[in-house]
Amino acid sequence: MTGWSCLVTGAGGFLGQRIVRLLVEEKELKEIRVLDKAFRPELREEFSKLQNKTKLTVLEGDILDEPFLKRACQDVSVVIHTACIIDVFGVTHRESIMNVNVKGTQLLLEACVQASVPVFIYTSTLEVAGPNSYKEIIQNGHEEEPLENTWPAPYPYSKKLAEKAVLAANGWTLKNGGTLYTCALRPMYIYGEGGPFLSASINEALNNNGILSSVGKFSTVNPVYVGNVAWAHILALRALRDPKKAPSVQGQFYYISDDTPHQSYDNLNYILSKEFGLCLDSRWSLPLALMYWIGFLLEVVSFLLSPVYSYQPPFNRHTVTLSNSVFTFSYKKAQRDLAYKPLYSWEEAKQKTVEWVGSLVDRHKETLKSKTQ
């Protein structure tokens, strides 16, 4: 156990940063390697300040670059793989998503075998399980239910294939004769300071007289705070490195939620921003069934125009379903196998996130002020 090291891919991202901040507190960790395509200068500076007893090495490169991955994995004890393209709206080209999310994961697994890395933790997503229909209700779902996303949309499809590859790699023989142990974590919708979807919703509202656009008023979900998802990764690596706990965790996937109240996406955005005068759109909205079929018609238009023009619909059947389903999950299995319990309460998570939303509001005010001067 002495002098181990950890590689975190996607370490410049929303979740990856939080994992790194928790990792530096781990005992006997000699080095953290943070990998991403590029790191913002301010994040590089923050990472440099985290260094105390633990060396922190910044690696910039492509997840599809095999020699780069092999170098990154050399002498590493644990890989936490969070790097991926997240695109629920279909903005990014399908081939790019499949390459990064699926091929990149496969190349990283192969690099682990060559470098004899014994532990691999994959950040999956709730979307590999669905929802497949807004009419299907899943409340307090669990890992024993045979749920699988059937949408052809590239993001959930790529994450599903990548997760299958990671779990199938459990038990592979490493170059040094050891064994690779893997597991996957499926977090709910993640919110918190720096959250890209929440940030987009808040900034859009600030430019729309403080009115929050409806993104999912018919949904019931259990969002999870980013700090708790990061904590689950720490517990997963501890479990896979513990000879007593590892057998029950190897090759398994876990839903990661916390004690955030079950609610709609719209309500979450409102709760986190109402202190600053933001409000929900009170205008009449279309019935869900009609929105679904309009989404279908927009898909048809996009398909018909595709030979001459790339039309990106504002929504489609998949996004309508994703944003308006009753789809909640329990973290009991993670509690049992990983000794997971949320590090942050709902009240703590809410307070931290609201403070961050306040910083977005202040920045918006400063921007308006500078434009009028």
UniProtKB/Swiss-Prot annotation:
One of its GO terms (cellular component) is mitochondrial membrane. GO terms for molecular function: 3-beta-hydroxy-Delta5-steroid dehydrogenase (NAD+) activity; 3-beta-hydroxysteroid 3-dehydrogenase (NADP+) activity; 5-alpha-androstane-3-beta,17-beta-diol dehydrogenase (NADP+) activity; oxidoreductase activity, acting on the CH-OH group of donors, NAD or NADP as acceptor; steroid Delta-isomerase activity. Its EC number is 1.1.1.145, 1.1.1.270, 1.1.1.210, 5.3.3.1. It is found in: Endoplasmic reticulum membrane; Mitochondrion membrane. It is a single-pass membrane protein. The chain crosses the membrane at residues 288-308. It catalyses: a 3beta-hydroxy-Delta(5)-steroid + NAD(+) = a 3-oxo-Delta(5)-steroid + NADH + H(+); pregnenolone + NAD(+) = pregn-5-ene-3,20-dione + NADH + H(+); 3beta-hydroxyandrost-5-en-17-one + NAD(+) = androst-5-ene-3,17-dione + NADH + H(+); androst-5-en-3beta,17beta-diol + NAD(+) = 17beta-hydroxy-androst-5-en-3-one + NADH + H(+). The keyword Isomerase applies. Pathway: Steroid hormone biosynthesis; Steroid metabolism. It comes from the Eukaryota. The keyword Lipid metabolism applies. The active site is at K159 (proton donor). Keywords: Endoplasmic reticulum, Isomerase, Lipid metabolism, Membrane, Mitochondrion, Multifunctional enzyme, NAD, NADP, Oxidoreductase, Steroid metabolism, Steroidogenesis, Transmembrane, Transmembrane helix. One of its GO terms (biological process) is C21-steroid hormone metabolic process. Adrenal glands, testes and ovaries. NADP(+) binds at G10, A11, G12, G13, F14, L15, Y155, K159. InterPro entries: 3Beta_OHSteriod_DH/Estase, Lipid_A_modif_metabolic_enz, NAD(P)-bd_dom_sf. Belongs to the 3-beta-HSD family. A bifunctional enzyme responsible for the oxidation and isomerization of 3beta-hydroxy-Delta(5)-steroid precursors to 3-oxo-Delta(4)-steroids, an essential step in steroid hormone biosynthesis. Specifically catalyzes the conversion of pregnenolone to progesterone, 17alpha-hydroxypregnenolone to 17alpha-hydroxyprogesterone, dehydroepiandrosterone (DHEA) to 4-androstenedione and androstenediol to testosterone. Additionally, catalyzes the interconversion between 3beta-hydroxy and 3-oxo-5alpha-androstane steroids controlling the bioavalability of the active forms. PANTHER family: BIFUNCTIONAL POLYMYXIN RESISTANCE PROTEIN ARNA, SHORT CHAIN DEHYDROGENASE_REDUCTASE FAMILY 42E, MEMBER 2. This is 3 beta-hydroxysteroid dehydrogenase/Delta 5-->4-isomerase type 1. The lineage of its organism: Eukaryota, Metazoa, Chordata, Craniata, Vertebrata. The gene is HSD3B1.
